[in-house]
Amino acid sequence: MVRKILIDFTKHITKSSLERHPHPAASFPLPASFTTVDSGPAKHSTAPPATPETSILVEDRNELPLRFHRLPVSEAEMQAVESGGAYAF
């Protein structure tokens, strides 16, 4: 007895040579060479490079403004973490 496959796949013909092409909705063409694209810093960057004179070294997070401080962890949260989530509040 011969089995008959119940799924009928449609023919899908692929190109023999896959070419890089832009997305149809792209507003710009692809560059001729991809090796020159990532060769330097982004051209749209507006931030100046950090120099030792302008950068600030902080050794403790508490020296930073409050928005950079760690949020306090309650005892109930610690119990939940230590129990692997099996702790009910």
UniProtKB/Swiss-Prot annotation:
Location in or out of the cell: Mitochondrion
GO-annotated biological processes: 2-oxoglutarate metabolic process; tricarboxylic acid cycle
Keyword Coiled coil set for record: no
A Gene Ontology term for the protein's cellular component: oxoglutarate dehydrogenase complex
Keyword terms: Mitochondrion, Transit peptide
InterPro entries for this protein: Kgd4/YMR-31
Transit peptide is among the record's keywords: yes
Assembly and interaction partners: Component of the 2-oxoglutarate dehydrogenase complex (OGDC), also called alpha-ketoglutarate dehydrogenase (KGDH) complex. The copmplex is composed of the catalytic subunits OGDH (2-oxoglutarate dehydrogenase kgd1; also called E1 subunit), DLST (dihydrolipoamide succinyltransferase kgd2; also called E2 subunit) and DLD (dihydrolipoamide dehydrogenase dld1; also called E3 subunit), and the assembly factor KGD4. Within OGDC, interacts (via N-terminus) with E3 subunit and (via C-terminus) with the complex core formed by E1 and E2 subunits.
Function: Molecular adapter that is necessary to a form a stable 2-oxoglutarate dehydrogenase enzyme complex (OGDC). Required for incorporation of the E3 subunit (dld1) into the E1-E2 core (kgd1-kgd2) of mitochondrial OGDC, and acting as a stability factor for the fully assembled complex.
Family to which the UniProt record says this protein belongs: Belongs to the alpha-ketoglutarate dehydrogenase component 4 family.
Name of protein: Alpha-ketoglutarate dehydrogenase subunit 4, mitochondrial
Gene symbol of the encoding locus: kgd4
